[in-house]
């Protein structure tokens, strides 16, 4: 074994794929299979939201992610498509700095705004159906010769000598695993409902912590959100929170009223002041840290994976 990757969310899987497809022998060790990781609760439209660090570094990683996800949208079975959508607000709204990478960003027309909203931005971007995408990533990793072991890691020190290269993609679990006191979980709860025919995603940018209203259509279903609850480690869905989520989404998209509720998901976004992507000596080998992507893990994962692969292979 050349590389041991810890974690099988989107960040761990893309890192493992980038190394395995380069010809290295890679094993993933994970506390839960991909479909049970935080990644499954992601929306997930491209955009490194709530990711900390220098903007130029985030833009570089995000650009790679945008390119890879856009290419995957042309392939069947990946769970990725190019979707149109809007970010709206009741107050003047500046676009995120990373939207400069989107070629068709434009102000919303008045007819495109929900009732009571005064401004917003319209664009197209990759939209990811996470259960399908995670299955695709796992299959791609295994086709490249990778192995996945469901076995929790209690301490990084137990892995010294396990492989010449160990990559820590443990997400919020890095708080205790490293340990990293700068690691803060940001709890996100979402509701899965039957889609009444909505085609465009919609995000309400009005701040109302810990609430954030968004909806992401995925064919016959639609993902409704959500929460940004900092410091909350609870991974069980709350019926009261779910009720508030649905009400918020109905408030900006009345077609959702009465939609059948199909399920609930909870994930812990791994936030820290700066994404941690760096290497350190580890026994006779090297330990890479690749975690702390906040709400931008799907968007940044391919760029971070490429940076690790370049270094390991050089």
Per-segment meaning from a language model:
Residues 2-27:
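N-terminal Rossmann-like FAD-binding beta1-loop-alpha1 element of flavoenzymes
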Residues 14, 160-247, 252-260:
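Flavin-dependent oxidoreductases
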Residues 21-40:
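Glycine-rich FAD pyrophosphate-binding loop
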Residues 44-118:
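Dinucleotide-binding Rossmann-like beta1-alpha1 core, especially the glycine-rich loop
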Residues 53-64, 120-136, 236-241, 299-300:
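Short beta-strand to alpha-helix junction loop
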Residues 80-84, 148-149, 254-266:
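A short coil-to-beta-strand element that immediately follows conserved catalytic motifs
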Residues 117, 121-154, 160-163, 169:
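Helical element adjacent to the flavin cofactor pocket in flavoenzyme catalytic cores
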Residues 136, 259-314:
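C-terminal catalytic lobe of FAD-dependent flavoproteins
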């Amino acid at each position: 074994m050349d590389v041991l990757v810890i974690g099988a969310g989107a960040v761990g899987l893309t890192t493992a794929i980038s190394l395995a497809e380069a010809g290295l022998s890679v094993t993933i060790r994970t506390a839960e299979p991909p479909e049970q990781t935080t990644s499954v609760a992601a929306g997930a439209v491209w955009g490194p939201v709530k990711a900390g660090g220098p903007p130029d570094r985030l833009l570089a990683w995000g650009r790679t992610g945008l390119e890879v996800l856009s290419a995957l949208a042309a392939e069947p079975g990946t769970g990725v498509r190019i979707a149109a959508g809007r970010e709206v607000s009741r107050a003047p709204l500046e676009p995120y700095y990373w939207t400069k990478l989107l070629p068709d960003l434009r102000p919303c027309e008045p007819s495109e705004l929900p009732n009571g909203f005064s401004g917003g931005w319209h664009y197209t971007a990759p939209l990811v159906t996470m259960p399908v995408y995670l299955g695709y990533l796992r299959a791609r990793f295994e086709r490249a010769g990778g192995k996945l072991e469901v076995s929790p890691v209690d301490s990084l020190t137990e892995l010294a000598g396990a492989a010449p290269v160990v990559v820590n993609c443990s997400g919020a679990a890095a708080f205790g695993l490293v340990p990293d006191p700068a690691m803060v979980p940001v709890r996100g709860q979402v509701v899965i409902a039957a889609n009444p025919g909505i085609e465009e995603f919609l995000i309400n940018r009005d701040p109302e912590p810990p609430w954030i209203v968004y909806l992401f259509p995925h064919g016959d279903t639609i993902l409704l959100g959500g929460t940004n609850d900092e410091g909350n480690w609870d991974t069980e869905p709350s019926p009261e929170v779910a009720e508030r989520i649905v009400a918020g989404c109905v408030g900006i998209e009345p077609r959702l009223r009465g939609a059948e509720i199909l399920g609930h998901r909870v994930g812990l976004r791994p936030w820290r002041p700066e994404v941690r992507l760096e290497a350190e000596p580890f026994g006779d080998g090297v330990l890479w840290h690749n975690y702390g992507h906040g709400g931008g893990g799907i968007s940044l994962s391919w760029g971070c994976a490429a940076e690790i692969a370049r270094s390991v292979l050089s």
